[in-house]
Amino acid sequence: VTGVQTCALPICRSSTQEELTTTIIGQVLFIFILVMLFTSYLSLFRKDYFDKPRSITMLYAMITLFPIFVSLMMKHNFFSVYIIPFAMAPIFVRVFMDSRTAFISHVTMILICAAAVKYQYEFIIVQLVAGLVAIYSLRELSKRSQIFITALLVTIASSVVYLALQLMQDNQVFNVDASMYTYFTVNGIFLLLSYPLMYIIEKMFGFTSNVTLFELSNTNKGLLRNLSEIAPGTFQHSITVGNLAAEIANRIRANSLLVRTGALYHDIGKMTNPVFFTENQAGVNPHDQLSDLESAQIIISHVSEGLKMAEKVGLPGIIKDFITTHHGTGITKYFYINYCNAHPTEVIDKSQFQYPGPNPFTREQAILMMADTVEAASRSLNEYTEESISNLVNKLIDGQVADGFFKECPITFRDIALAKQVLIERLKAIYHTRISYPHLNVRQNAGKKTS
């Protein structure tokens, strides 16, 4: 090594060090801007996620873990980064949260990963298309086959987009790197792991997927089977309420599967004292032997008893919320009014007749409260005409609005108006008038032959 070369070595090292430092600073700045933009999106459009620590944790974990995997693979020259199933992240966010957040988080994650990848333009385009296909092909996860179809579509879409990009650059089919299609196939196979991993994430972060809701709505096992045997009247009421609530949810674009499942479980606490509820009584009313205050306490207790049962079998929190909110902080009006009439001079503690609450804080919970109240009250009508049903529905729901039951949930007046419309339509169909068939008189000559 000559003297000139010896002097040049420190200069080369210094130049390389400066380039490396500059690159790192640029990457950190780039990532910081992307994370801030993603946080701004959440604070502007999905502020509710900040009230759910597990949701926020999962979102930031997704946009952090995948870039770490990419950096490690690039640093140690492992397999191609194209075998990493990046589309898995938007699948999880889509299933447990929403489509828009799934796409925004996916874009953020891919752009961060691109900072460590060669041929960034190609990588970004292929992965963005793969993510979009995954999101739109998996709108509602209700069957295992959907994951397989999604993995297949993502593999095909990635392969076609890569081929298109290569043709635009080289104009030669034969110059396309065939090994890339092997990577895309492996990527699709890894994407199938989304299904078992989904269960782990669900338990880890406390989410509830559609698959779990379908399993919980099976009426042939568990609490629902017990409900059908111990309190058959309540069971039928719950099914009817679930159908009404699901119809409303479909009309206002809420989660119909969630509200139907919640409706099936909302009255499970009645199994403790089934005969104290009118739908399970067979002529004898045990409340006749009790004071109004005692009766009110038994009726109110079905909420706390239902919550105990739900916790015992490990029902998800999102279902337990339907149990606690379906009466809100309302009162047992029948027994409260009776007590007031019987004790006109007494200063009455209203809280003794009041449900513990809380009031509904989601649209689905508000839907259940409306459907439950209307269905129960509809059975007390003397006649089922369009006018009587319409008056009942409007009176009950307007009363709930006036009492402030829906102040804590994001339901609109338009949603409530549509809910009324659905309830009136469905109750008219349930209690439609039937034709009275004529009585067939016995004909004396019916069996004789005529000559």
Each predicted region: which residue ranges?
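Generic, well-ordered alpha-helical scaffold segments in large soluble proteins
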Residues: I91, V95, I110-A114, G131-Y136, ...
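Divalent metal-dependent catalytic cores for phosphoryl transfer on phosphate-bearing substrates
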Residues: G222-E386, G399-D403
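Generic detector of multi-pass transmembrane helix bundles and their immediately adjacent loops
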Residues: S43-F235
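Residue-level signal for the membrane-embedded core of alpha-helical transmembrane segments
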Residues: F32-I33, G188, L192, Q365
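Long, compositionally biased intrinsically disordered regions
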Residues: V173-Y183, F190-F205, S209-L258, L290-L293, ...
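Short, small-residue-biased leader/transition segments that mark boundaries at the very start
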Residues: T2-L9
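Cytosolic-side membrane-insertion boundary helix
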Residues: I11-L34, R46-P53
